From Swiss-Prot:
A motif (Q motif) lies at residues 164-171. InterPro entries: DEAD/DEAH_box_helicase_dom, Helicase_ATP-bd, Helicase_C-like, P-loop_NTPase. Belongs to the DEAD box helicase family. MRH4 subfamily. A motif (DEAD box) lies at residues 334-337. It comes from Chaetomium globosum (strain ATCC 6205 / CBS 148.51 / DSM 1962 / NBRC 6347 / NRRL 1970). One of its GO terms (cellular component) is mitochondrion. It catalyses: ATP + H2O = ADP + phosphate + H(+). Residues 1-35 form a transit peptide. The Q motif is unique to and characteristic of the DEAD box family of RNA helicases and controls ATP binding and hydrolysis. This is ATP-dependent RNA helicase MRH4, mitochondrial. Residues 439-576 form the Helicase C-terminal domain. Its EC number is 3.6.4.13.
C-alpha cells in the first residue's frame, strides 16, 4: 500500500514535502571540508624558502611589511580599548597536563623544586641559549642596513659645516651613470650593449640653468683621476722617490725645492680635458675643481692634471699636441650648444677627433639643446646616453618676470628694484660707456663687463656676484664706499644706495657663470630667441633661489612674444 501511494506522487511534490535538514544531511561531509581547505590553500602564501628571489643583485625590499614586534604593554596600554587584549592563540594549559603524564621523564626532586619556586626555573630557562637567541634576532637585520648605520657617521663627519648637501635632480641621475652604476630598474641601453666593442662611453647632460651640472660631471672626473693615480706604476715609483727626497732634506718646505726635483712622469700630459667657451668659465670650473679636490696640487698625478695653466692662449694645434700622447681618457664639453655652434664647431671637432682614440668617457653638457645640436649628436654619436631633467628648457618657477613699456611717458622709477645684487644684460657687443657712469651719478655702484674688459678685471668684477655670502659692512666701510662713489661720480649725486652692486654686461655674462648672488636681471633688449631668454633670465634664481626679471619693451618689440614667455614661466612649461 505504501509503495503504491508513494509511487503515485510526483517528484516535485515529493521534494517539497521532504524536510530541508534531510537534504543537508544527505550531502557528503567531505565536500564542504575539501572546498574550505581549497579556499584556505589558495589564499595562503607559499613559504619563503620555496620562492626564488627576484632581487638578488639589488637586495631585499626595504618597504616590505614586517611582522610587528612583541612589546610589553605600558601602564596605559588598556586605555581607550573596546576589545580585551587577549591572545586567543595562546591557550592556558590545564593542571595536570604537563610531562607528569608521560611516565616521569623528570625526577620528583626537580618537579617539587619547580612547584615551590616557579620563578627560579623560568629564569634558568630564559638564560639558556642566550647567545643563539641574540644571533637569531640580529640575523633579521640586513647587512646593508647595519653598514648604512656605520656610514651615516662617516657622512656626518665628511659633510660637517656644509649646507644643502642634497644632490640636485641632474646630479642624482648623472653621477651614478658616469660612475657606471645603474639607477633603479634602468634597462640596458644600446650604449651599454655596444660598450665592449667601442670601449667608450658617451653621455649628454641636459638640465635647466643653475641646477648643478658642473659638479655632476666634475666629481666623476675627479674620481676617475684618483683611480688612475692608484693604478699608475710610474706615479707610484715617483712617489717613493719623492718621499725619500723629503726625508733627505729634513723639514725643508717642498715648495722651495720641488722645481729642482725631477718632473712628474705625467707632466704636461692631461688625463682629463674640460672645454668651455669663455675664460670666465675656465676660472669658475677650475675653482670648483680645487674646492672639491683641495689636495690636487700636492698629489702627483692630480698635480700633473692641474699643472697646466688654467687658460691656454694658443692656436688649436697646440691643444691638439697636448692630447696627442694618448693619455687623455676623459673629455667634457660644457655649454655644448655654443662649442658646437658655427663659430666654435671646427676647433671643437678637431680636438674631439684627436682625443677620440684614447677616450673612455665623453661628456656633453648644456642647458639648451637646439635641433641642430640634437641632429648632430644623433648622426655622430648614435649610442650616446641622454640624461635630461623634467624641467629642461624651462625657466625656474621661482623667477618672476615683469614687463615695462618704455614707450609710455613718464617711465616708472627703476631704483626701487635695486634691492640687492643686480645683473643688467643687453645684446650689443659693447654697452655704451655712459650707462655705468649714469648709474654711478645716481649713487649706484655699477661696473661694465664686455669683451674689451681686461681679463684680470673680469674675475674681480664677478667675485661679488658669484659668492653666496651676504654683504656685511660696518658703518665705517659703508661711509667710505659712499664717499668713494660720490667722488667717482664727480660730486653730482648727494645720495648713495648702500649694499647694492650693478653689473652692465653683454651676453658674455649670460652663459654658465654661477651668479648665485644675483636676484634681479634687467633685459634692456628683448631676446630674439627662447635660448637667449633661458640663459639671460637664468642668471637669477639659481639652485632654487628666488629671483626677478624685468624686460624693457619698446614700440618696435614683439609684446605678444614676451607675453607668451611670461605665461609659460608662470605655468612652469618649457619654452619650445
Amino acid at each position: 500500500m505504501w509503495r503504491a501511494a508513494r509511487g503515485s506522487v510526483c517528484l516535485l511534490c515529493r521534494s517539497a514535502a521532504q524536510p530541508r535538514t534531510a537534504l543537508l544531511e544527505s550531502a557528503q561531509p567531505w565536500i564542504s571540508q575539501r572546498s574550505f581547505a581549497m579556499r584556505r590553500d589558495a589564499t595562503r602564501e607559499r613559504p619563503s624558502r620555496m620562492v626564488l628571489s627576484d632581487r638578488v643583485a639589488r637586495g631585499p625590499r626595504t618597504d616590505a611589511p614586517r611582522r610587528p614586534r612583541d612589546r610589553p604593554d605600558g601602564p596605559w596600554a588598556g586605555a581607550n580599548r573596546t576589545v580585551a587584549n587577549v591572545d586567543r592563540d595562546r591557550r592556558r594549559r590545564p593542571p595536570g597536563s604537563t610531562q607528569e603524564r608521560d611516565g616521569g621523564t623528570r625526577d620528583r626532586d626537580t618537579r617539587d623544586t619547580r612547584e615551590r619556586h616557579p620563578g627560579a626555573s623560568r629564569n634558568r630557562d630564559d638564560n639558556r641559549f642566550k647567545a643563539l637567541k641574540m644571533q637569531r634576532a640580529l640575523t633579521s637585520i640586513a647587512y646593508r642596513e647595519r653598514v648604512n648605520v656605520k656610514a651615516q657617521g662617516v657622512y656626518n663627519e665628511v659633510l660637517k659645516g656644509m649646507v644643502g648637501v642634497k644632490p640636485t635632480p641632474v646630479q642624482r641621475l648623472a653621477i651614478p651613470a658616469l660612475l657606471g652604476q645603474r639607477i633603479g630598474q634602468q634597462r640596458e641601453t644600446n650604449h651599454r650593449r655596444a660598450a665592449p666593442e667601442s670601449k667608450r662611453e658617451e653621455f649628454l647632460l641636459a638640465a635647466e640653468t643653475g641646477s648643478g651640472k658642473t659638479l655632476a660631471y666634475l666629481l666623476p672626473i675627479i674620481n676617475a683621476l684618483k683611480v688612475a693615480e692608484a693604478d699608475d706604476v710610474d706615479a707610484k715609483a715617483y712617489n717613493v722617490r719623492l718621499e725619500a727626497e723629503k726625508e733627505r732634506r729634513g723639514g725643508t718646505p717642498v715648495s722651495e725645492w720641488i722645481d729642482k726635483f725631477e718632473p712628474h712622469p705625467n707632466h704636461a700630459r692631461p688625463r682629463a680635458i674640460v672645454l668651455v667657451p669663455t675664460s670666465e668659465l675656465v676660472d669658475q670650473v677650475l675653482a670648483a675643481s680645487k674646492k672639491n679636490f683641495p689636495r690636487g696640487q700636492d698629489q702627483t698625478t692630480a698635480a700633473s692634471t692641474w699643472s697646466l695653466p688654467p687658460r691656454i692662449f694658443s692656436p688649436t694645434w697646440r691643444i691638439v699636441t697636448l692630447i696627442s700622447s694618448r693619455v687623455c681618457t676623459t673629455s667634457s664639453i660644457d655649454e655644448a650648444d655654443s662649442l658646437f655652434d658655427r663659430s666654435f664647431a671646427p676647433e671643437t671637432s678637431k680636438i674631439v677627433e684627436r682625443a677620440m682614440p684614447s677616450l673612455k668617457q665623453l661628456i656633453l653638457c648644456s642647458a639648451t639643446i637646439p635641433r641642430r645640436l640634437d641632429n648632430y649628436l644623433a648622426a655622430h654619436f648614435p649610442n650616446i646616453v641622454r640624461i635630461a631633467t623634467p624641467n629642461l628648457h624651462a625657466i625656474p618657477r621661482r623667477v618672476q618676470l615683469g614687463v615695462i613699456d618704455v614707450s609710455k611717458d613718464p617711465l616708472p622709477p627703476t631704483t626701487s628694484w635695486l634691492a640687492s645684487h643686480h645683473g643688467l644684460c643687453q645684446t650689443s657687443a659693447r654697452p655704451p660707456r655712459r650707462w655705468p657712469s649714469t648709474l654711478v651719478s645716481k649713487g649706484i655702484d655699477a661696473i661694465a663687463l664686455h669683451r674689451d674688459t681686461p681679463e684680470h678685471r673680469q674675475s674681480e668684477m664677478l667675485n661679488s656676484f658669484t659668492t653666496t655670502e651676504p654683504m656685511r659692512l660696518s658703518k665705517a666701510e659703508v661711509e667710505a664706499n659712499k664717499q668713494a662713489a660720490l667722488a667717482k661720480a664727480g660730486g653730482v649725486s648727494k645720495r648713495h644706495l648702500a649694499n647694492t652692486k650693478v653689473i652692465v654686461a653683454t651676453d658674455l655674462a649670460s652663459r654658465g657663470i654661477d651668479t648665485l648672488a644675483v636676484r634681479h636681471v634687467v633685459l634692456y633688449d628683448v631676446p630674439h630667441t627662447t635660448i637667449d631668454f633661458i640663459h639671460r633670465l637664468g642668471r637669477a634664481g639659481r639652485m632654487g633661489r628666488r629671483g626677478r626679471g624685468v624686460v624693457l619693451v619698446g614700440k618696435d618689440d614683439r609684446r605678444d612674444v614676451v607675453s607668451e614667455v611670461k605665461e609659460s614661466m608662470f605655468m612652469g612649461q618649457a619654452l619650445i
